């Protein structure tokens, strides 16, 4: 039984305050005490979601990844339409980054609704309900008569789109065993970061074409409907408590034994419990936990830089290099994309080698082992930032390649940082991630608001240099917690104590 859960972009979907990934373990203590409790018929129960075929599991993984990619794509796609939108509505270009920021703020608040719903009704209902409304809100953006309509609808795009973002990691934990999850989850979360990179590239070409900027929303609607319907056909309900509740209902009808019940029938969370788990306890943990505070600040910087560069790249390439075609000016984002792909390889390779070796030799892996990849790649992000800034007056290819180390750092640091928080807080990881998500999204979402002014006033070189120095200041964090993390955990009331390990690795 593993106490781990995969990393999450905007908050993990919980499992009744138990760790994700535990659902395959039968509740033996309940079975012994009460024969009316409906549970799995052992680990090989054919209805258990982890016993789906590998083909079906990969189909579920890539279906959800496709959905989340288009959700995050929508957050950045309007970043390249600043000038045509501001000209059409006769407003200042300075307000346009708000169209991106409001989506990210929606990403922060949405999981407060979707995560509790996934505990009560399972994964499918909140995922597809939210995704459907997310798609519908593309229509008023596409036909908006004024800027206010765009801004309001963009916020709700984030709120409803966050359903798949927040519930998706729970699905990964439901269907994959801890070892295989180490291969599947990097692909899922890479799709979350791929969307914001593709947004300005595809959006730039659409904006420059005869279709115009409004077709960025129409394209999002069309692709969302296609991949949403595909996922609706492929993705089943995977949340064990709800599946057992459905089994108990079927058995009551078949046997006429009304005494049969499932765990969820008797332990349905209350509104007060949800409020404590997602509001009160996250707030207390954020104030009292040095691990949570430090990693939230670090991950907020990473998240903010990703979205800040949506405004910085147009300054560096469209304005400074006079690339007038917005689609062409967005192609340098491919450098970051290449770096993220390399980051996936780094995580998977280390999972199948170093982590597997530790697990085989020791039977468990300490949470601090997550930080090895962070330590190795922590310098790549500042290298990418310094490189990007001081290559502003060199050949464009030199500046584009700077995105490779930047992409490696963004992906590996973010993913392993989130995994470390989950491993450290285990059964309370939902509260820790809720605190991290709120702070990270609000702090990171504010970066696009000052990005353009910062790069205009300081120049590409010095603006990137300042960000580079800030990221250098964050480099000691994984090193410090790798050395002192066990001692800090020993003093905490919320974390795994010193000496405790975690089960099979799940990066």
Swiss-Prot record:
Glycan attachment points: 51, 90, 257
Record localization: Membrane
Protein name (record): MFS-type transporter acdC
CDD domains: MFS_Tpo1_MDR_like
Region (Disordered): 1-50
Family: Belongs to the major facilitator superfamily. CAR1 family.
Keyword Membrane: yes
GO CC annotation terms, alphabetical: plasma membrane
UniProt feature, compositional bias: Basic and acidic residues: 21-36
Topology of the protein relative to the lipid bilayer: Multi-pass membrane protein
Transmembrane region(s): 58-78, 95-115, 125-145, 155-175, 186-206, 215-235, 290-310, 328-348, 371-391, 395-415, 442-462, 466-486
Gene Ontology MF terms in the entry: transmembrane transporter activity
UniProt entry keywords in alphabetical sequence: Glycoprotein, Membrane, Transmembrane, Transmembrane helix
Function field: MFS-type transporter; part of the gene cluster that mediates the biosynthesis of aspcandine, a pyrrolobenzazepine alkaloid.
Gene from which the chain derives: acdC
InterPro entries for the chain: MFS, MFS_dom, MFS_trans_sf
Cysteines paired by S-S bonds: none
Pfam families membership: MFS_1
């Amino acid at each position: 039984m593993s106490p781990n859960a995969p990393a999450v972009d905007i908050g993990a979907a919980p499992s009744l305050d138990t760790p994700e990934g535990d659902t395959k373990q039968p509740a033996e203590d309940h079975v012994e005490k009460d024969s009316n409790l409906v549970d799995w018929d052992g680990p090989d129960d054919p209805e258990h979601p982890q016993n789906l075929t590998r083909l079906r599991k990969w189909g579920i993984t890539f279906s959800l990844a496709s959905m989340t990619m288009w959700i995050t794509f929508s957050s950045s796609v309007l970043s390249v339409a600043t000038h045509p939108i501001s000209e059409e509505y006769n407003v200042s270009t300075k307000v346009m980054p708000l169209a991106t920021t409001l989506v990210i703020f929606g990403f922060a608040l949405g999981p407060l609704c979707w995560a509790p719903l996934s505990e009560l009704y399972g994964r499918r209902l909140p995922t597809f309900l939210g995704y459907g409304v997310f798609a519908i809100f593309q229509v008023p953006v596409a036909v908006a008569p004024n800027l206010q309509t765009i801004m309001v609808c963009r916020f709700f795009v984030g709120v409803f789109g966050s359903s798949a973002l927040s519930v998706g990691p729970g699905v990964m934990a439901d269907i994959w065993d801890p070892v295989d999850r180490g291969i599947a989850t990097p692909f899922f979360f890479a799709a979350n970061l791929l969307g914001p990179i593709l947004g300005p590239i595809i959006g730039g070409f659409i904006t420059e074409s005869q279709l115009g900027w409004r077709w960025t929303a129409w394209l999002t609607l069309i692709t969302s409907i296609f991949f949403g319907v595909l996922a609706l056909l492929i993705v089943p309900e995977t949340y064990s408590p709800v599946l057992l509740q459905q089994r108990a209902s079927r058995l009551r009808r078949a046997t006429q034994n009304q005494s049969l019940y499932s765990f969820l029938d008797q332990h349905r969370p209350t509104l007060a419990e949800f409020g404590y788990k997602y509001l009160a306890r996250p707030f207390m943990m954020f104030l009292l936990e040095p691990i949570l505070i430090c990693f939230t600040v670090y991950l907020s910087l990473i998240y903010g830089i990703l979205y800040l560069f949506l405004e910085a790249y147009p300054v560096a390439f469209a304005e400074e290099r006079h690339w007038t075609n917005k689609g062409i000016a967005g192609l340098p984002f491919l450098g970051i994309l290449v770096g993220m792909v390399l980051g996936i390889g780094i995580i998977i390779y280390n999972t199948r080698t170093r982590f597997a070796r530790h697990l085989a030799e020791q039977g468990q892996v300490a949470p601090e082992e997550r930080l090895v990849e962070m330590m190795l790649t922590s310098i790549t992000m500042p290298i990418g930032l310094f490189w990007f800034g001081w290559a502003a007056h060199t050949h464009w290819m030199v500046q584009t390649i700077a995105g490779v180390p930047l992409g490696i750092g963004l992906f590996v640091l973010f993913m392993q940082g989130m995994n470390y928080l989950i491993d450290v807080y285990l059964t309370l990881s939902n509260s820790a991630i809720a605190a991290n998500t709120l702070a990270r999204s609000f702090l990171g979402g504010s970066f696009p608001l000052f990005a353009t002014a910062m790069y205009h006033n300081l120049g590409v070189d010095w603006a990137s240099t300042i960000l580079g120095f800030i990221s250098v200041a964050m480099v000691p964090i994984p090193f410090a917690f790798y050395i002192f993390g066990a001692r800090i955990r020993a003093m905490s009331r919320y974390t795994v104590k010193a000496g405790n390990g975690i089960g099979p690795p799940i990066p």
